Amino acid sequence: MSDTLNLLAKKRDRAGKGASRAIRREGLVPAVIYGDKTPAMGITVDHIALFKMLNTGHFMNSVVTIDVDGQKLPTIPKDVQFHPVTDRVLHVDFLRVSANSLVEVAIPVSYVDEEKSPGIKLGGVLNIIHHELKLKVKATAIPEEIVVSVAGLEVGDSIHLNQIKLPEGAELAHDEHESTAATVIAPSGMKSNADDEADAALAAAASAASAEKKEAEKSE
């Protein structure tokens, strides 16, 4: 399970663009907590503390417990808005969750055991299509990553989404469950050799057909 993050916050009564700019000048970030059948709550959080959390690499798929003036609220980050030039955080949306809440999150995928793949040993390249998997999972059971073994894969073999083992209680949120997650492709040199062999085979077949035709013409 991914780590739970803790963030201090204060309620905010001010709203609107002017109020948000004033909040940012104070070194704070305006944010909102919504969901779980409760009214939305406007808050402010410290920009530096939030920036550190963003740099953990798993902020968007972690439970963030927000302490709002002593009231601790478990949430999931749903959207982060950045300044287009400075990359400063402008606003954050947090979804309030409970122990039984089902959430949709993007989980990073780690592909392992490349040294056990015959195709990769022969020079094949692991072409990764899905670096993340979208899962529906309980908020209290969000995995930190999904580990996928490529052991035994030959050149041309693929792993599909529906072949990946998921944590108990989790399910894919992708529309196409049979789409390819990763495949072992032939390197350019191997492709060239295969093409050359195919061309040679075609040339030999054409030559043989021509010889047979000539023999047939002679016999006539």
Swiss-Prot record:
Keywords carried by this UniProt record: Ribonucleoprotein, Ribosomal protein, RNA-binding, rRNA-binding
Keyword Amino-acid biosynthesis: no
Protein name (Swiss-Prot/TrEMBL): Large ribosomal subunit protein bL25
Its job: This is one of the proteins that binds to the 5S RNA in the ribosome where it forms part of the central protuberance.
Assembly information from the UniProt record: Part of the 50S ribosomal subunit; part of the 5S rRNA/L5/L18/L25 subcomplex. Contacts the 5S rRNA. Binds to the 5S rRNA independently of L5 and L18.
Family the entry assigns: Belongs to the bacterial ribosomal protein bL25 family. CTC subfamily.
Alphabetized PANTHER family for the sequence: RIBOSOMAL PROTEIN L25/GLN-TRNA SYNTHETASE, ANTI-CODON-BINDING DOMAIN-CONTAINING PROTEIN (PTHR33284), RIBOSOMAL PROTEIN L25_GLN-TRNA SYNTHETASE, ANTI-CODON-BINDING DOMAIN-CONTAINING PROTEIN (PTHR33284:SF1)
Alphabetized Pfam families for the sequence: Ribosomal_L25p, Ribosomal_TL5_C
GO terms classed as biological process: translation
Source species: Zymomonas mobilis subsp. mobilis (strain ATCC 31821 / ZM4 / CP4)
Gene Ontology molecular function: 5S rRNA binding; structural constituent of ribosome
Matches recorded under InterPro entries: Rbsml_bL25/Gln-tRNA_synth_N (IPR020056), Ribosomal_bL25/Gln-tRNA_synth (IPR011035), Ribosomal_bL25_b-dom (IPR020057), Ribosomal_bL25_C (IPR037121), Ribosomal_bL25_long (IPR001021), Ribosomal_L25_dom (IPR029751), Ribosomal_uL5_bac-type (IPR020930)
Record has Ribonucleoprotein as a keyword: yes
GO cellular component: cytosolic large ribosomal subunit
Xref: CDD domains: Ribosomal_L25_TL5_CTC (cd00495)
